[in-house]
């Protein structure tokens, strides 16, 4: 080995210290793969500023950014899941629950809060998809019924942000029963003349889409949200036909009348508050009082020329 090769040998070269970048500062859009400053993405409600892709949002953050500050009260937080069936597949259900609670920071897959949106009273609930795929079990059903009862008690509307893969298989029939339980609760809400607005986010599938998510007086979808019962691959294998482009996306569902409207997440507060106000007979938060309108400049109507 020559003297030059010894100098250039990697072991003799002092490596330059890499600048350490704290984790969580940068992230990447899951659609266009644009590198994004995470703080800016948070301010934009998890919507990519380049391609407007709506990323999945934590349930608690969704409610905290949707409801007015200072008026939020959580409901049903004392309810916790139990492994009554002692269920075990590749892993015990208790272990799955513990892992999901640690990863998501929630006790179960639904968060319920009472509050107001732009001054309009409302009870709102949101699914936490990172908790076992937002699956609906007995606690999710119980918390949703608690939300319905709170809406009836306070004579206000109910809104639910769905993000779920469906019923929780580890709870077997008890999870399937929640489909009927939540649907019956919404029937009581309807009998009292109170509105239910369902917002379907990406993804809303399975037993949740087949029950509470599609029972809204107004059904709203977020842009490009996956909404349906069975997955595309399962349907294609069953019917043995190729499905059209964009099948089960919110735009496709709107075009075919399955949902009522698509609303950008950044416009959700104003749109929902306006709908709730109209459906409950309250003053719309978007309507400005006539007394608050700016005064017009004085204008004199010219007299018509008199004929001599």
UniProtKB/Swiss-Prot annotation:
It is an enzyme of class 2 (transferase). The keyword Ribonucleoprotein does not apply. Belongs to the AccD/PCCB family. It is found in: Cytoplasm. Binds 1 zinc ion per subunit. The keyword Lipid metabolism applies. InterPro entries: AcCoA_carboxyl_beta, Acetyl_CoA_COase_Trfase_b_su, ClpP/crotonase-like_dom_sf, COA_CT_N, Znf-ACC. This is Acetyl-coenzyme A carboxylase carboxyl transferase subunit beta. HAMAP family: AcetylCoA_CT_beta. It comes from Vibrio cholerae serotype O1 (strain ATCC 39541 / Classical Ogawa 395 / O395). Zn(2+) binds at residues 29, 32, 48, 51. The gene is accD. A zinc finger (C4-type) spans 29-51. One of its GO terms (molecular function) is acetyl-CoA carboxylase activity. It catalyses: N(6)-carboxybiotinyl-L-lysyl-[protein] + acetyl-CoA = N(6)-biotinyl-L-lysyl-[protein] + malonyl-CoA. GO terms for cellular component: acetate CoA-transferase complex.
């Amino acid at each position: 080995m020559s003297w030059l090769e010894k100098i250039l040998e990697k072991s003799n070269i002092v490596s330059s210290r890499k600048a350490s970048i704290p984790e969580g500062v940068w992230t990447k859009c899951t659609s266009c793969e644009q590198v994004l400053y995470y703080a800016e993405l948070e301010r934009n409600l998890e919507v990519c500023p380049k391609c407007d892709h709506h990323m999945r949002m934590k349930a608690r953050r969704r409610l905290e950014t949707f409801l007015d500050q200072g008026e939020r009260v959580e409901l049903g937080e004392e309810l916790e899941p139990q492994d009554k069936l002692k269920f075990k597949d590749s892993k015990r259900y208790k272990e799955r629950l513990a892992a999901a609670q640690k990863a998501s920071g929630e006790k179960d897959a639904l968060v319920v809060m009472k509050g107001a949106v732009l001054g309009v009273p409302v009870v709102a609930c949101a699914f936490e998809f990172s908790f076992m795929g937002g699956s609906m079990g007995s606690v999710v059903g119980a918390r949703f019924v608690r939300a319905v009862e709170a809406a009836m008690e306070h004579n206000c509307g109910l809104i639910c942000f769905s993000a779920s893969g469906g019923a929780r298989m580890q709870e077997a029939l008890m999870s399937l029963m929640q489909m009927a339980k939540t649907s019956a609760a919404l029937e009581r809400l309807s009998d009292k003349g109170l509105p239910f607005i369902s917002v379907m986010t990406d993804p809303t599938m399975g037993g949740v889409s087949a029950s509470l998510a599609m029972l809204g007086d107004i059904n709203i979808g977020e842009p490009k949200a996956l909404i349906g019962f069975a997955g595309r691959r399962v349907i294609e294998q069953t019917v043995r036909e190729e499905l059209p482009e964009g099948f089960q996306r919110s735009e496709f569902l709107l075009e075919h009348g399955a949902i009522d409207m698509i609303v950008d997440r950044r416009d959700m507060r104003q749109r929902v508050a306006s709908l709730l106000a109209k459906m409950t007979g309250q003053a719309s938060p978007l309507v400005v009082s006539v007394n608050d309108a700016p005064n017009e400049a004085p204008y004199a109507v010219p007299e018509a020329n008199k004929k001599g």
